[in-house]
Amino acid sequence: MRHDGRQHDELRPITFDLDFISHPEGSVLITAGNTKVICNASVEDRVPPFLRGGGKGWITAEYSMLPRATNQRTIRESSKGKISGRTMEIQRLIGRALRAVVDLEKLGERTIWIDCDVIQADGGTRTASITGAFLAMAIAIGKLIKAGTIKTNPITDFLAAISVGIDKEQGILLDLNYEEDSSAEVDMNVIMTGSGRFVELQGTGEEATFSREDLNGLLGLAEKGIQELIDKQKEVLGDSLPELK
């Protein structure tokens, strides 16, 4: 039994609050245990210069964390005048993951900006951001289809992400909170589609190594968790994107 009472293969309680902010085309507050992230999707009728005239759209992301999202206050990166390497890595990860499940030609020459703002952090902020950002993007695209701005749904599959890790005493764990992540011998972030294909794997041994058997166990548990997340995504989206099942 884990410190928070969960089984080794159990997700933290997860909720999606849709239309959390009224201005963006898509907005979701994702809550995973004590981690809370606001994910907004904004549509812009232009693309970066390197894509102009090519008939393709673009999806890009920004990620930030409120100063007291963590136990100790952190200085805003805007006050420092530059973003950290960690922030840049996460932003690129979110954008890459979302583009993997979108036909950019069907999107047309427009950009979807994803803004993920962590308002409370207890581990798994990047995976929660990806899972929530997919929903925000899907809502925004659903509105474009309803308005007749685009004719066909460019989303090719569902998308979600989760963390898994190996604890010295408890073995393989699903959906690590901050305490578990800090002490894990191995931790991994896994991004997958609804059809069970991998988008990205990020795995690291922390002063430890892991075997192929361990890797298979981690991926199997991640696949289980991601399928549960995608089932919840489908439930909250309902029929707003009927072409996507």
Curated annotation (Swiss-Prot):
UniProt superkingdom: Bacteria
CDD domains: RNase_PH_bact
UniProt cross-references to Gene3D superfamilies, sorted A to Z: GHMP Kinase, N-terminal domain
Record InterPro entries: ExoRNase_PH_dom1, ExoRNase_PH_dom2, ExoRNase_PH_dom2_sf, PNPase/RNase_PH_dom_sf, Ribosomal_Su5_D2-typ_SF, RNase_PH, RNase_PH_bac-type, RNase_PH_CS
Keywords assigned: Nucleotidyltransferase, RNA-binding, rRNA processing, Transferase, tRNA processing, tRNA-binding
EC number(s) reported in the record: 2.7.7.56
Loss of function: phenotype: Correct processing of the 3' end of 23S rRNA no longer occurs in the absence of mrnC.
Record SUPFAM superfamilies: Ribonuclease PH domain 2-like (SSF55666), Ribosomal protein S5 domain 2-like (SSF54211)
Keyword match Nucleotidyltransferase: yes
GO terms, molecular function: 3'-5'-RNA exonuclease activity; RNA binding; tRNA binding; tRNA nucleotidyltransferase activity
GO BP annotations, alphabetical order: rRNA 3'-end processing; rRNA catabolic process; tRNA processing
Coiled coil: none
A Pfam family per the record: RNase_PH_C
Chain residues that bind phosphate: R86, G124, T125, R126
Catalytic activity of the protein: tRNA(n+1) + phosphate = tRNA(n) + a ribonucleoside 5'-diphosphate
Top EC category: transferase
Summary of the function given for this chain in its UniProt record: Phosphorolytic 3'-5' exoribonuclease that plays an important role in tRNA 3'-end maturation. Removes nucleotide residues following the 3'-CCA terminus of tRNAs; can also add nucleotides to the ends of RNA molecules by using nucleoside diphosphates as substrates, but this may not be physiologically important. Probably plays a role in initiation of 16S rRNA degradation (leading to ribosome degradation) during starvation. Plays a role in the secondary pathway of 23S rRNA 3' end maturation.
NCBIfam families: RNasePH
UniProt family annotation: Belongs to the RNase PH family.
Subunit comment: Homohexameric ring arranged as a trimer of dimers. It has been suggested that the active form is the dimer which binds tRNA and that the hexameric form protects the substrate recognition loop (approximately residues 65-82) from proteolysis.
Protein name as it appears in the record: Ribonuclease PH
